Amino acid sequence: VTPEQLHDFLCNPHSYPHQPAQAELIQTHTSYVVIVSPYVYKVKKPVNFGFLDFSTLEQRHYYAEREVELNRRLCADIYLEVVPITRQGNRLTLAGDGQVVEYAVKMRELSKPDFMKTRLARGAVGEEDLLRIVAKLQAFYAQQPTTPEIAECGRIENLRQITDENFQQMEPDIGQTLSWSAFETIRFYTNSFYAQHASLFAERRQTGRIKDGHGDLHLEHIHLAPDAVCIYDCIEFNDQYRCVDVAYDTAFLAMDLDYNDRHDLARRFVRHMAAALDDPGMLRLMDFYKCVRACVRGKVETFRSNQPEVDAETRQQSQERARRYFRLALQYAVAGSAPTVLIVMGNVGTGKSTLAGRLAAELGWEVYSSDRVRKEMSDLPLHRRSSPAERGRLYTPEAKAEIYEQLMQRAEEHVQAGHSLILDATFSRRRQRDQMRQRIEQVGGVWSVIEAHAATATMKERLAARSTGTGAVSDARLEDFDTIVHAYQPPYEIGLRQLLPVQTEGPLAGTISAILNDLAARQVRRS
């Protein structure tokens, strides 16, 4: 049967025995899903992505049966049967006579308002819902045996095979949905985590934490009806993707909540799961598995965007989602899940604003610059140097204190909302740095400091160039050099665990990659 014939058959309401009023077709990169109330039919596409192979009719039949069998574990009443699609002459029929050309999984339709993603969008997911999901998963995992074969899926060699395949499949996306720096950093973080935490992975296997689980536990696969929680569409096509650490399943849903800007729910869900499973050790793996899962989702969105039948608007939306997932993976690799304030400081002309801007683009974080805040507060043009009279007002001790107070307030607001950000300012006085660190910690944030450095000649060249250029926001020029440099107090009070000195005279791309890799290495050591 051709794709066009199958498409037309599935979209025709008369193809179904119960004669629905309409047939709504949804395509994924692996299947056709047809909503024909009160049922849903799902037909696998003849695709082969390496980790998933539906290329023959026999394989599609086998995996359709596996889908029903496996999903009945968590959603018993929804998965009904596997129905053959047959052909007699040019006519296709569900469960008819003739040659079998495809197989469809038949399911009961779930109420649209109760899908977790839909409820989350209208602000209707709360603590009680999290506890219902946790209770469902706790009972499920308790019923799943841990055999030696299943435990092997948690071995580093097997996990590395999966992540290496991810990186191989992500590589064509470099320059489109993720940068080379992000790709290299995520790969470095992943392999460094394996190397430094081998004993942790071994302990997870030995203590029975590897289960025949779900493997694809995200918002779109959870249905929260008033009387039942249904967790459906587990992975049937690859046992190694489904037989995972319980921390891996937990991390997937937590990552998806982060992606949807519900960091509060993500943190509470992880905390409840660790308590319910008596598994505090999962917390050490959470950022690692979140990073892996964000990469998988980015990869899946890229696959979806590359499908030939996808229209231009859907392709663009999938690519943007892929970018967001890959940025999220990078955030986990360099900063973990806690709201982070990355302070980019340094003397005049060291290139800190350039660093801050590029890091913000890579990480998807907002950046607040003291130079920009100063001019916005005074309603002055950003790219015009302030007049001598204006500078006399803007750079008094009181005015400087107000600028740093504004930066501190913005940092507090972001951290309290669960968001990370970048601050770009000289931070030339120890008092400013101490106050910032104290206030970030008081609201539950973490912080790191990048101090930009450059040779004196380079700093002066950059300041001189501002006099002839038009793009600088900063008012500092070459005549201000000695005054600013002499007032700068190096951050000797900050230990090297949180201070990263950076030379800015090399190629910018290489400097950014080195910063991201260094931050990732620190994140691995903190885990």
For the regions a language model picked out, list residue spans one by one.
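Conserved NTP-binding catalytic cores of kinases and kinase-like/nucleotidyltransferase enzymes
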Residues: 1-106, 111, 225-229
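Conserved lysine of the Walker
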Residues: 352
